[in-house]
Amino acid sequence: MSLIRPALVLFILLTLLTGGVYPLLTTSLGQWWFNSQANGSLIRLNGEVRGSALIGQNFTAAGYFQGRPSATAETTDNPMASGGSNLAASNPALDKAVSERVQALRAANPDADPRVPVELVTTSASGLDNNLTPAAALWQVPRVAQARQLSVEQVTQLVNQATQTPLLSFLGQPVVNILQLNMALDALKDK
């Protein structure tokens, strides 16, 4: 009987601490210090949510930059269905899918270098990658410029402006957020 009371008190105390105080504290700090990130890194235009800086979208029109292909192609609007294809590099299905993507990209981008950047034909581990390297974005510039009736220099300048350098300039590689780049293209059209 003498052990039950301290065990019960400790159980109640730890339940309140780990089930109440700790979650409230971490949620409050997250909302205070990292409000945008804690709420999904949403990108808004005129008060309307256009997407998240963290979730890739499927852009198919010629006047938009395209992101990485998704292994969740059937459910591109559902980020809960994220995941890679889990196909091995030696799998014929992966080889066929990559070959088809290369052919489609070459057909859609006839003025681009025939060497297609690898991230435009392979899926990411999450299937929802939102960024490309500047090289992959620049590869698409001739198609986007032609479709939008802009100069290659204008579109290249937008890509360069949208390029984000990694933290401390050495932790990672520069990337271009495709949603933000496409929104910048739309803003250029509206001017």
From Swiss-Prot:
It is a single-pass membrane protein. It is found in: Cell inner membrane. InterPro entries: KdpC (IPR003820). Disulfide bonds: none annotated. Its main location: membrane. The chain crosses the membrane at residues 6-26. One of its GO terms (molecular function) is P-type potassium transmembrane transporter activity. One of its GO terms (cellular component) is plasma membrane. It holds the Pfam family KdpC. Keywords: ATP-binding, Cell inner membrane, Cell membrane, Ion transport, Membrane, Nucleotide-binding, Potassium, Potassium transport, Transmembrane, Transmembrane helix, Transport. PANTHER family: POTASSIUM-TRANSPORTING ATPASE C CHAIN, POTASSIUM-TRANSPORTING ATPASE KDPC SUBUNIT. Part of the high-affinity ATP-driven potassium transport (or Kdp) system, which catalyzes the hydrolysis of ATP coupled with the electrogenic transport of potassium into the cytoplasm. This subunit acts as a catalytic chaperone that increases the ATP-binding affinity of the ATP-hydrolyzing subunit KdpB by the formation of a transient KdpB/KdpC/ATP ternary complex. Belongs to the KdpC family. The system is composed of three essential subunits: KdpA, KdpB and KdpC. This is Potassium-transporting ATPase KdpC subunit.
